């Protein structure tokens, strides 16, 4: 009875303790600090440095690094220390959004930062040189999408048109470097197309396997690309400033992880089409987001996901549990058959199948649920990784501030290991020591080995596995009780039948003696 109580008690304590994480969190404000001519901006996912010298973006540092990712500086020519966040800049580097051309100002004045919304920050840089007045407005959001919106307002007070170039950076082609990609009419490539061969220029940027640094161009803009004598490729977009007019250009920079759903959300889905694995994950991610919107907490979303999964798989798991329990109870008979027919494997297999048929069990019945649950586990793992930004910005659960990162205290790792050991103990309650010794100890060692090698997996995955294993162990306990009760009833019936036969034999003997 103690076994049966331990599992629901652990699950109940987990649910009650998680109640504190039910409420949604308020929008997080963006922090900033003005240091000399620079302003440093910190969001939940990245760190930025803007400068009044050119009104440029000098650094985009991805400090949030979920499992399988690493911190990264995206601006060419900038190096960021992961510990101190101190920056070093290459001499002569071209920073994103520097404006070059006829009379473009080199120095700007930073206005007072404003907050259009609690989780937004608006920076405005104003510069003037001659007849050109330039205003650059950067809008940052504390969300999961790594975007910086830019509005460039060009006022030309002169009598001549001005040709301007808005640069995203410089690029030195070399092995292992990021790829320079242009997008025209929704198709990405490394070449700049002739003006007459496309309808719209969508943008330009740098891509590697993990990150994307891509500028969505303003409507009607044209690509810009120049190769310097040193071999550097300067790239960006061209802007027109007609005489006596004020023009406004709206652009958007995506500087973040290379994740299809994030990029699709900001209109860059065609830049990186998902593979088969990503397509399989999309429904799982969308379902998790649906549960999150219902509960406002990814911890509860994972709990509901686990419960729904266990309910759907209940018939299969029930059959698996019965099959495994019966198999354990048949071990003595199986061993006798194997010893008896060890010299004739064909006959041994025939006798084993006869025993399985007599007991009404299929030795392969336990495989199907395992084959179904493993892909679910893998898909959930990938879904948590691909939803890491949303999870990072959501409220914490229990002691876990971020379910996309590892458990800092390894509590879930230890609990899951203990529940797995308990489940293994429930699976081998009747096996004789000689038969089950190696199997039993292997079953106890495996959870420990798993914990040692996978301890740094996302806490959300450990939460799912803990709940799923706990529910499976509870279900196995109930199956063991059902089978034990059935065997007791069968044994009682057999004993009663035996007593009846003995009484019948005794009566026949008395009759014969009387005759």
Describe each model-derived feature in a short phrase:
Residues 25, 200, 206, 503-506:
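Intrinsically disordered, low-complexity regulatory regions of eukaryotic regulatory proteins
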Residues 33, 39-270:
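Soluble non-transmembrane domains of integral membrane proteins
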Residues 18-27, 62, 66-69, 73, ...:
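Intrinsic disorder/low-complexity segments
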Residues 26-35:
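N-terminal low-complexity, Pro/Thr/Ser-rich intrinsically disordered segments
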Residues 2, 11, 15-17, 21-23, ...:
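Helix-loop-helix
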């Amino acid at each position: 009875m103690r076994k049966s109580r331990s599992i629901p008690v652990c699950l109940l304590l987990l649910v009650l303790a998680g109640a504190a994480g039910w409420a949604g969190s308020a929008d997080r404000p963006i922090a900033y600090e003005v240091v000399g001519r620079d302003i440093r901006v910190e969001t939940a996912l990245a760190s930025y440095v803007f400068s009044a010298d050119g009104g440029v973006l000098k650094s985009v540092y991805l400090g949030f690094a979920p499992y399988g990712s690493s911190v990264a500086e995206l601006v060419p020519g900038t190096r960021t220390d992961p510990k101190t966040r101190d920056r070093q800049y290459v001499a002569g580097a071209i920073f994103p959004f520097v404006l070059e051309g006829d009379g473009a100002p080199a120095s700007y004045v930073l206005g007072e930062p404003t907050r259009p919304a609690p989780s937004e920050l608006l920076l405005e840089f104003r510069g003037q040189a001659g007849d050109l007045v330039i205003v650059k407005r950067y809008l940052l959001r504390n969300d999961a999408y790594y975007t910086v919106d830019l509005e460039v307002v060009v006022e030309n007070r002169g009598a001549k048109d001005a040709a301007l170039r808005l640069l995203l950076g410089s690029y030195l082609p070399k092995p292992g470097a990021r790829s320079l990609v242009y997008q025209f009419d929704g198709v990405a490539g490394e070449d700049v197309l002739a003006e007459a061969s496309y309808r719209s220029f969508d943008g330009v940027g740098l891509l590697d396997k993990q990150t994307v640094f891509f500028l969505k161009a303003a409507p009607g803009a044209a690509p810009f690309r120049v190769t310097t004598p040193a071999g550097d490729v300067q790239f960006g977009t061209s802007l027109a400033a007609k005489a006596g007019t004020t023009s406004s250009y709206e652009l958007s920079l995506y500087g973040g992880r290379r994740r299809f759903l994030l990029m699709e959300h900001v209109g860059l889905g065609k830049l990186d089409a998902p593979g088969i694995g990503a397509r399989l994950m999309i429904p799982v991610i969308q379902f998790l987001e649906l549960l999150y919107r219902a509960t406002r907490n990814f911890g509860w979303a994972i709990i509901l996901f686990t419960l729904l999964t266990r309910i759907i798989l209940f018939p299969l798991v029930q059959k698996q549990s019965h099959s495994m329990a019966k198999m354990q109870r048949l071990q003595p008979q199986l061993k006798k058959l194997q010893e008896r027919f060890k010299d004739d494997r064909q006959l041994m297999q025939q006798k084993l199948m006869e025993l399985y048929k007599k007991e009404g069990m299929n030795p392969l019945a336990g495989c199907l649920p395992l084959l179904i649950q493993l892909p679910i586990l893998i898909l959930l793992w990938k879904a948590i990784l691909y939803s890491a930004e949303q999870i990072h910005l959501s409220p914490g659960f229990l002691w876990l501030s971020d379910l996309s990162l590892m458990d800092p205290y390894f509590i879930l790792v230890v609990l899951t290991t203990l529940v797995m050991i308990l489940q293994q103990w429930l699976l081998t309650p009747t096996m004789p020591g000689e038969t089950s010794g190696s199997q039993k100890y292997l079953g106890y060692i495996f959870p420990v080995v798993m914990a040692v090698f996978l301890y740094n997996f996302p806490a959300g995955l450990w939460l799912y596995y803990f709940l799923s294993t706990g529910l499976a162990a509870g279900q196995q306990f109930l199956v063991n009780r059902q089978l034990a009760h059935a065997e007791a009833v069968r044994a009682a019936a057999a004993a009663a039948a035996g007593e009846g036969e003995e009484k019948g034999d005794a009566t026949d003997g008395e009759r014969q003696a009387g005759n």
